[in-house]
Amino acid sequence: PILLIGNAGCGKTSYALELIKILQGKPGIKIDLGNSVANFTCTGSDPSYKDAKKGIIIESMFAGNDNKPIKNPIIHFDELDKIHQDEKYSIETIFYSILEKNTAKQFRDNFFGVDVDASGINYIFTANSLKTVPVPIVNRLKIFHIPDYTEEQFKTSVLDNFYQKWLKINNLKTECFPEVLSDEIKEKILEICKCDSRAVNDAITQVFARTIVYDDAKDSHIALFSAR
């Protein structure tokens, strides 16, 4: 299990999601620990309870397209530093067992009432800081520190990647927009986002909104520049 740690907006979560997609060929299971996640999210809940369901551990092992078991799926736990330790059903207690190979070999899903070998599951954690992460959990993880993006990195690669995703998300015709971002456009985007990856999409939208018009002939939005 690994932990990617770095300041907010450094790209660690995006990297984890892309890495999982590359390794598995599809998106993996992502759990946001900042949302007060209970331990039965992993272990499953008692079938006698209303809305009971299986846990994500066993779910991940049968998440293949053909429903055949997967020995080594990947689960992503985001915002480990926001884990709620003082709650009765804190997920923290589960980490002590699933992050140890020996105990993970006999992991029990409460919904099905069976033990499964979960020792092959891979875990990627992301966090902004180690300060609030329990030491026993830290000791079970291989830690990688992710540095902030430099302005040069933003200009040469980050903005281009975000721009291509922005076009796809907004279903915009690429022939009506710049194939690549010019230095002028990048400067305008950087003025708004301040090298914060979380603000890039909004910054791109703001810059292009100043220039976009609708072309009836092409039945599409087109981008005109300069963005000043």
Label the predicted regions.
Residues K168-A223:
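Conserved AAA+ ATPase small/helical "lid" subdomain
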